[in-house]
Amino acid sequence: IRLSLVGSEMCIRDRYMYDNGYEWLVMMDDDGIPDKNEIKNLIQSYDKVVSAVGKEVILNALVADKDDKDYTAFLWARGSRRTTKITELQKEQFFNDIHPFNGTLVKRSVIEKIGMIKKEMFIWGDEKEYMARAIHNGIGLYTVPAAIHYHPKEKGRKGNIIPFISKYQILVKPEKMSHYYYRNEGFVYNTYPEKKKHMIVFCTAQIVYNITHFRFVELAKFIKYFREGMHNKY
């Protein structure tokens, strides 16, 4: 196995690796730390997962909080009841849920099929768009718990859509950079049929949250940038 580390934005790194003939790309942010056996475990698991699910896949390491290694750095998707405890997750060989671009193994054949990362979406959305594109093209997304990647804890926070009622929550990003998130979500929800069916629910949750928390400036920002993303205005 020949390994190279290439800096710069992920879209530039991946283009360099692809153009130089590499068979495998491992995507990760510069604030993540791979376990010493991460890449080995991902590559060794690839054919096993493909054989089990019967289609091409993108594999991901299990992303642990680097300051509390007993738990994942990120929560799972909305509605998921999957645990965040590492030892429980490691009881499975692989599962259909990932935290992408944190130890993400992509085979060259997948890139040939779905293309490169949309560079304009860098930060809080490029990874989500690429995974949505993969799903749209019939590619499976799986975490391999034997492969571990360490990352700082999620910067967003969960907020109650209606104050004091914790049953319904959304991910709340820091206001200083939230426009990137809104714009990229607009593009993803409006582009892929698998996501479009959930767009009304997502927008309603954002609107209600900002109204009930008196965040009217943030609400205006959400409407502006979500619409820009819907129309691919970058």
Which residues make up each language-model segment?
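Short, small-residue-biased leader/transition segments that mark boundaries at the very start
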Residues: 1-12
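Active-site nucleotide-sugar/metal-binding loop of Leloir-type enzymes
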Residues: 12-24
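Short beta-strand-to-loop acidic/aromatic patch adjacent to the donor-nucleotide binding site
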Residues: 22-33
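Acidic donor-binding/catalytic loop of UDP-sugar-dependent glycosyltransferases
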Residues: 32-45
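Short beta-strand-to-loop element that shapes/binds the nucleotide-sugar donor at the catalytic cleft/hinge
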Residues: 59-71
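A recurrent flexible, glycine/aromatic-enriched loop bordering the glycosyltransferase active site
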Residues: 87-106
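A short, conserved alpha-helix in the catalytic core of glycosyltransferases
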Residues: 104, 110-115, 120-147
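Non-catalytic, C-terminal membrane-associated alpha-helical segments of glycosyltransferases
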Residues: 189-234
